[in-house]
């Protein structure tokens, strides 16, 4: 574990977006963290009861440990994060970024724990994405594309990213030969892409409020559009502002089958090191429910991804 004492996360008791407003690079978001704050605040609007099944829980893909978190060593971050997530029983994800060290360190971290995970790639030009899919295959149980990241502020002017069409994504899906996820469903354009592509997994997300997109929360978008999205995808997942059991239940009530957890896992890792993420998940669910909610595609009895 190698953590810079001057990390950028404030270690808030509850991560709600209000202590790091507008900090980007950093832990905040665009529009003075407006969508980040809304993501955290609005799941409660859709909580009705505990009678729904818990959605599965997965670590969200996160990179940029040095510039965004203040971690001392970029590569080590992925090993520490993945190991702590395995200890917590979470299904795994890794992300992509610039430089390529970010993706390839994530792949190494999965190999280190002898696990597979969801690999979420940035929307690079097609040929580069084919190469990245190939490099990820041995460690991937799911291949995904962060389609909304073409407009991400932290990579602007550093690399060429593209707004992907359904045709572009269909070529990647065919090449991957694995369950294929589209992450970043948050606009009417995104819904049309899902309708044409029919992905195995559609992930409602506004990138944690870190990209310039429509204003609003993941919860409100799911409430308005999940049923329509579900008609054209195998599963619908959610990513954004999910912090506690009631949030998970609200997501489940809307039809979400799996949720991604991001910033709170970083906070937990920084606070309690290798035990942090387990302590965090156990504190909000309890050990028995943690076992129910956590699991990876390769080890839990998930439904097969039927073609819509």
Question: How does the language model describe each region?
Answer:
Residues 18-58, 113-117, 126-127, 134-142, ...:
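Generic structural signal for short, solvent-exposed loop/turn connectors between secondary structure elements
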Residues 107-115, 159-160, 197-198, 217-220, ...:
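Short low-complexity, flexible loop/linker segments enriched in glycine and/or proline
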Residues 1-39, 219-308:
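Alpha/beta catalytic cores of nucleotide-metabolism and tRNA/nucleoside-modifying enzymes
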Residues 1-125, 305:
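N-terminal capping/small domains of soluble enzymes
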Residues 86, 174, 295:
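Short polybasic/polar patches that bind polyanions
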Residues 73-79, 102-108, 129-133, 165-167, ...:
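Well-ordered, non-membrane alpha-helical segments in soluble/globular domains
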């Amino acid at each position: 574990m190698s953590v810079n004492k001057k990390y950028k996360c404030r270690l808030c008791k509850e991560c709600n977006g209000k202590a790091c407003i507008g900090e980007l690079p950093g832990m905040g978001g665009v529009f003075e963290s407006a969508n980040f704050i809304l993501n955290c605040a609005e799941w409660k609007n859709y909580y009705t009861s505990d009678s729904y099944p818990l959605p599965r829980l997965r670590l969200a893909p996160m990179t940029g440990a040095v510039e965004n978190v203040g971690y001392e060593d970029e590569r080590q971050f992925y090993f520490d994060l993945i190991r702590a997530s395995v200890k917590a029983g979470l299904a795994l994800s890794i992300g992509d970024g610039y430089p390529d060290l970010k993706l390839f360190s994530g792949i190494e971290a999965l190999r280190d724990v002898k696990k597979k995970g969801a690999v979420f790639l940035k929307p690079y030009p097609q040929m580069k994405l084919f190469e990245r899919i190939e490099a990820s295959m041995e460690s991937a149980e799911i291949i995904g594309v962060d389609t909304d990241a073409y407009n991400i502020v932290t990579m602007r002017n550093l690399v060429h990213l593209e707004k992907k069409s359904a045709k572009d994504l269909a070529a990647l899906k065919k090449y991957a030969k694995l369950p294929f996820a589209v992450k970043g469903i948050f606009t009417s354009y995104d819904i049309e892409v899902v309708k044409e592509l029919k992905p195995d997994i559609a992930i409602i997300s506004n990138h944690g409020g870190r990209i310039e997109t429509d204003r609003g929360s993941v919860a409100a978008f799911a409430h308005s559009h999940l049923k329509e999205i579900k008609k054209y995808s195998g599963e619908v997942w959610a990513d954004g502002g999910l912090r506690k059991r009631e949030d998970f239940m609200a997501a489940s009530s809307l039809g979400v089958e799996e949720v991604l957890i991001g910033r709170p896992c970083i906070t937990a890792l920084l606070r309690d090191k290798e035990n942090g993420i387990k302590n965090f998940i156990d504190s909000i669910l309890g050990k028995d429910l943690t076992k129910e909610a956590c699991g990876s595609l390769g080890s839990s009895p998930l439904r097969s991804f039927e073609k819509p």
